[in-house]
Amino acid sequence: MIIGIGSDLIDIRRVEKSIERFGDRFTHRCFTEIERARSDRRANRGASYAKRFAAKEACSKALGTGIAQGVFWKDMGVVNLPSGKPTMVLSGAAALILESMLPAGHRPAIHLTITDDYPLAQAFVIIEALPESL
């Protein structure tokens, strides 16, 4: 059963300006080490960071909190499976809120899609509760 849906659309230029203005202060505040390593290797660095930023916003909306209630940017991280498929890993308050959303006997599955078409980046998150027996 679906227990949360979130989406976000962001202007890549806004993220590029934040990186130019604040540099590591911005990237270290909002992104995990894995996200920074992946984005810094990209030719389109700003687009890579923007997609991850949009994913965090979408995830916070799917959790029903936004970036509030103790949920911080780095509590939500975009990681890629060996196939390249992006997924979200939650920690801290985000993980606790997700756990509180789950019906008894269920485990979470977070589905994520991210895309960009300059000057926009977009993310969709669906949080699903799956029976533990599956």
Curated annotation (Swiss-Prot):
Annotated Gene3D superfamilies: 4'-phosphopantetheinyl transferase domain
Any one Gene Ontology molecular-function term assigned to this protein's record: magnesium ion binding
Entry-linked InterPro entries:
4-PPantetheinyl_Trfase_dom (IPR008278), 4-PPantetheinyl_Trfase_dom_sf (IPR037143), ACPS (IPR002582), Ppantetheine-prot_Trfase_dom (IPR004568)
Signal peptide feature range: none
Task: Note the SUPFAM superfamilies from the entry.
Answer: 4'-phosphopantetheinyl transferase
What EC identifiers does the entry list?
2.7.8.7
Residues that, per the record, bind Mg(2+): 8, 57
Listed GO biological process terms: fatty acid biosynthetic process
Where found, per UniProt?
Cytoplasm
Please report which protein family the annotation says this sequence is part of: Belongs to the P-Pant transferase superfamily. AcpS family.
Q: What does this protein do?
A: Transfers the 4'-phosphopantetheine moiety from coenzyme A to a Ser of acyl-carrier-protein.
Its recorded name reads Holo-[acyl-carrier-protein] synthase
UniProt organism field:
Rhizobium leguminosarum bv. trifolii (strain WSM2304)
